């Protein structure tokens, strides 16, 4: 009951730090993430070393945030405005993402919690559009942890369209997982 409009970030690239608090880009790349110029050093490969082990990968690279499943809780908490990342993304990304968040906001506002269900096909569309090894619900319900990170790759993981095999003639054949086109 603040009388102030409340906005929350609901979809897109998560900052490793709490957004607006990261100094790593300034210190390493000379570009302030707090001024919209983040060099994304969290998306670089890093190596963790201790006396007993070493681990390499994209250890500081979070998966992208997807809050479609959380919309009822966010609306009930009094959130007025949903922020969707779109910087340096294709128009298709912004269009589909905004469409789906509008669709599910309207679904909840008209049908309530008992009729609220996010279709798997819609989540798959978002995954096909852009994801870093899956989505996370970020910091909404728990502290960050390994399940929040995309340590194998820092960028779009592409589309899994099927399985390939080499036939007897030495040609590549692809067995599609679903209809293409």
Ranges and model annotations:
Residues 1-181:
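Surface-exposed amphipathic alpha-helical tracts and adjacent flexible/coil segments at the periphery
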């Amino acid at each position: 009951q603040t009388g102030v409009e409340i906005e929350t970030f609901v979809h897109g690239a998560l900052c490793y730090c709490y957004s607006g608090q990261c100094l790593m880009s300034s210190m390493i790349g000379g570009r302030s993430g707090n001024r919209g110029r983040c060099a994304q050093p969290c998306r670089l490969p890093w190596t963790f070393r201790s006396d007993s082990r070493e681990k390499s990968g994209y250890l500081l690279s979070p998966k992208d945030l997807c809050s479609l499943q959380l919309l009822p809780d966010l609306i009930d908490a009094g959130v007025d405005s949903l922020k969707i990342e779109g910087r340096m993304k294709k128009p298709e990304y912004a269009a589909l993402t905004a469409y789906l968040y509008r669709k599910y906001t309207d679904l909840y506002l008209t049908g309530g919690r008992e009729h609220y269900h996010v279709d798997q096909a819609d989540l798959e569309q978002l995954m096909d559009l852009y994801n870093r090894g899956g989505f996370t619900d970020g910091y909404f319900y728990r502290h960050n942890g390994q399940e929040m990170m995309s340590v194998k790759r820092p960028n779009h993981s592409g589309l899994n369209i099927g399985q390939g095999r080499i036939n007897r003639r030495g040609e590549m054949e692809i067995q599609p997982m679903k209809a293409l086109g």
